[in-house]
Amino acid sequence: MKITEKLEQHRQTSGKPTYSFEYFVPKTTQGVQNLYDRMDRMYEASLPQFIDITWNAGGGRLSHLSTDLVATAQSVLGLETCMHLTCTNMPISMIDDALENAYHSGCQNILALRGDPPRDAENWTPVEGGFQYAKDLIKYIKSKYGDHFAIGVAGYPECHPELPNKDVKLDLEYLKQKIDAGGDFIITQMFYDVDNFINWCSQVRAAGMDVPIIPGIMPITTYAAFLRRAQWGQISIPQHFSSRLDPIKDDDELVRDIGTNLIVEMCQKLLDSGYVSHLHIYTMNLEKAPLMILERLNILPTESEFNAHPLAVLPWRKSLNPKRKNEEVRPIFWKRRPYSYVARTSQWAVDEFPNGRFGDSSSPAFGDLDLCGSDLIRQSANKCLELWSTPTSINDVAFLVINYLNGNLKCLPWSDIPINDEINPIKAHLIELNQHSIITINSQPQVNGIRSNDKIHGWGPKDGYVYQKQYLEFMLPKTKLPKLIDTLKNNEFLTYFAIDSQGDLLSNHPDNSKSNAVTWGIFPGREILQPTIVEKISFLAWKEEFYHILNEWKLNMNKYDKPHSAQFIQSLIDDYCLVNIVDNDYISPDDQIHSILLSL
């Protein structure tokens, strides 16, 4: 959705101020993965109206990362995204590529900028075959895409740094040209002089510009960064900022606390001015400072606002990619690997995403693992060692999983996202299984008719009821598999799939081609929703991915000359099978799966 539409929609239904976050593209692959996790956590904590991603001009890897970040934010994280686009080092061919990628990812918002001079240049000069001014870029976007994109422009409350003599009148003329060219909203440069900003807003309105004015808010984290950023932007520092920060400049913690209070006072004055109802926070890819500002302003969402958010309509985050608009069902196997699931289904057409059925002959095939990129494990090889050390026994792996279940580890090779409170009803049993060398991979507890607004298990529209069958996926020594199968042979409630790295599949599923709904919800005036399933075809695709993850982990060990760990992980691949069991008796409180596995 366009930013302008979102802000107007919110204005008509609530008088509460809104906000957004800006992130820049990290330089390393590990930094990118860390940023995705941070963006996700900040969304969960605050429900921003949108995020925006800065542009790394000049081509190469970093430019592609800008569009990759936008696509992932839209498609995987379900975040409304605005993409920066600059004229710096950008011939039209590169601009076309960036716009096309944004368009296909579902992004509907562009912040059109001239951009700063390249790092190795003293002055800004246009690139051959590109644009000199932001207004020309705006006109070009409009000519190619019409009204598909809401286009933001930059505003400078203290004038553009390159304008001679701080000519405010001329700067406003340039801003008006960008609005007249098709700009839909203004995001300003950072500032600290709130009185000057309010006066500037009055001049913007007097000049006939009626689009939303969104102030850019820079948190104060350290004294040195505070001075450096003010100097870089050539902005003034009010006396009351200096008088409160100078005496404590060597105490980072106190600077952060007092600095946050100063920014909160500034933001409150902006919101009270009548010109501003939305704050755009420059996060600098940090998490705590922006959330502290919002918390002290008392504008973070209430519990009811969290429950009413449209992305909570399913137990997994709804994608904003238009190709996935019909998606209502996902296999449970990728519950903790949403990035690879979206990648492996990215080639599906709009009408191929299941919205009620899954696993029949008409279902599309999962894409190759190559679609996930060069690495299936999201952490760098060095980070893998830091997180998971060098396991040489099944007890070492069990120790890692138990730490993950207890929240002491945020991820595992096969689990990209942290564990949550959903597992609490079966957590003790999961830990006990791992202590008995049965390595748990994925799970969910039984749920029988909990209200859909429940903090932990709830999802979907309010006033409904949600249900779950208990599900457990685990690694089991092949030597124990015959006894498990024999035990399950006469059990009418427990269904399973078991497979090894060679693809030998065993199952007691009554119809291997049909899906088994393991999560469903009943809501007033709607058909039953069944968003999470277990079925054969997707399990075979997941098995391929899982054993490739183990192999990649092994190769990391070889890379760092850890032969004993590499040999052990190879033994996991060779000697363990991947099993999942569903307890279809969602009413019984007994944990049959746990009891049976402990008896093996």
Swiss-Prot record:
- Superkingdom in the source lineage: Eukaryota
Q: What CDD domains has UniProt attached to this entry?
A: MTHFR
Keywords from the named record: FAD, Flavoprotein, NADP, Oxidoreductase
What Pfam families does the entry give?
A: MTHFR, MTHFR_C
Which residues does the record give as FAD binding sites? T54, W55, H84, R114, G115, D116, Y133, A134, Y156, D171, K178
Gene Ontology CC terms: mitochondrion
Residue positions of the active site: E22
The pathway entry for this protein reads as: One-carbon metabolism; tetrahydrofolate interconversion
Could you confirm whether the keyword Manganese appears in this record?
no
What are the protein's GO molecular function terms?
A: FAD binding; methylenetetrahydrofolate reductase (NAD(P)H) activity; methylenetetrahydrofolate reductase (NADPH) activity
Which top-level enzyme class is recorded in the Swiss-Prot or TrEMBL entry?
oxidoreductase
- Enumerate the residues binding substrate: D116, Q189, Y282
What EC number(s) would the UniProt record show? 1.5.1.53
Q: Which residues bind NAD(+)?
A: E22, Y23, F24, V25, P26, K27, T54, W55
What cofactor(s) does the depicted protein rely on?
A: FAD
Q: Which family does it belong to?
A: Belongs to the methylenetetrahydrofolate reductase family.
Q: What is the protein named?
A: Methylenetetrahydrofolate reductase 2
Origin organism of this chain?
Answer: Saccharomyces cerevisiae (strain ATCC 204508 / S288c) (Baker's yeast)
What's the name of its gene?
MET13
